[in-house]
Amino acid sequence: MNTTEKKEIKNFRDRIDKSIIRKQKSMQEHIELLSHKNIREVDKEKRLAILKSTLQQAVELEFGTIPIYLCALWSIKDNLDPIAKSIRNVVQEEMLHLALACNMLTSIGGIPKIYDTTPKGLRYPTKLPGGVHPELTLKLSGLNDDSLDDFLEIELPQGEIFIEEFKGKYHDANEHGEHSNTIGALYTAIQNEFESLNPTMLPDKQISGPLAWFVVDDFKKIKSAINWIKEQGEGAIEATEEDIKIHELSHFYRFLEVRKRKKIEKDPVTGKYSFKIDLPFPDVWPMAVVPEGGYLKKDVSSEVWDLTHQFDLTYSSMIHTLESAWDQGGQAALWKAIDMMFNLEKFAIPLMKIPIPGKKGNYGPSFRLIKY
């Protein structure tokens, strides 16, 4: 090893030390650190600290999209509408992804953190955690073309989009083909570091159960968990058209169907997939974008405030319960949290039926965490 190489390694180690101390790191920084050619020259405990930080970011990313998808779902008047069913499945799968990310973090001694009432906690509108898709701001609103454009950006595949040429709302910010700032890219870096570091993985406090959550205690299961997340969300990196089955569309292609008002169908002659059958857009409550900080008591009627406050209280309790599942609560706490999440609609939907005086659109939930 020559002097230049030794200096590079020292500089990288110093960078790792500074990164561990710094609380807020971008997704790109996590990817760069885990993928750096000198990562193997770093002390194992420090590499483990970076991996834990990266997995915590994955947990925040998986959870961060759920409220905006729930708003879209609840705004659909007929909950049996095919599009409502599709979005409901997306939410359920995002919960699965969250559970798998929490299991991966717990497997190496980390503690998933979601409940955060400090100014650094999740508040809408917001950027995706870690600087993923920095051009995008997550907003709480009903189902419409603007929200669908945001959903497509969130679920943008890391690999090629093969149904047809895709130009999204933020196409000037992306070079389509290989996308380096996607959630899939983050998981690729996580998988590679698990393989390289080969940490001891413990099943303690992980969750497994009937909804296909499973304990990750070796690299094979890590790889399975990450592949599952990628394929259900953005779509498989190496997917071919034969991999896409109509009833198993990734989130990106499900949202693309709704945006195009067309179902993706396979041509029995050519074997190619394209947009064919009309997909009627559902009748929705016109939920307006929730303002920064949410709706305040002084600005709304007592009816709106009661619904808003009850929603926030229940939501906060749900998040607290969800987080406890990977501490002491286990499967029972997770089931309780999921049940609470879907019960939030009894406050959200009545809000969505109330027009905002003097403005366009209706009210909706603010998804505020309350300290209790």
Each model region followed by its residue ranges:
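Non-heme di-metal
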Residues: 2-372
